[in-house]
Amino acid sequence: MGEMVSFSSNGGTAEGYLAVPDTGAGPAVIVIQELWGLVGHVTDVVDRFAGEGFVALAPDLYHGKSTSEPDEARKLNMGLAMDAAARDIAGAATYLTGRVENTGRGIGCVGFCLGGSLALWSATLSQDIIATVGFYPALPWARMSPTWSRYAG
């Protein structure tokens, strides 16, 4: 159902898996990967969101790498620069905001495990992200630097 697309991020180009609903338009959501990378489960979730009427995008935060081995997944996670991941997520939000198929007033963001943490953090990364859901997040706040000031007052 979906396809790999490229979008601007980190002063270069990032990739992600995009699926558009059969109706051709709908609100947009970012789906953030688990520890394993952009694997079949994540692309299936993106396709299911599209099946429910959403324009869905999963950015590839490991840039082409994925695994089913726990030790390798931990290595990939430890090598993930949170500032680069943040820019990839913000880039995905900007990309979705500019898609003609996006009929929403903002972007939603969901994630699983590592992605659950990043989904919750994403609301502080881009003003376009207006709703987040983190499924079983592990919150490595020491590796993140959320800016909560935009929610003050």
Report each predicted region and the residues it spans:
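Cysteine-centered metal-binding/redox modules
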Residues: 1
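Serine-hydrolase catalytic machinery in alpha/beta-hydrolase-like enzymes
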Residues: 4-102
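A catalytic-pocket lid/entrance helix-loop region that shapes and gates access to the active site
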Residues: 77-80, 149-153
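Primarily recognizes the serine-hydrolase "nucleophile elbow" in alpha/beta-hydrolase
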Residues: 90-151
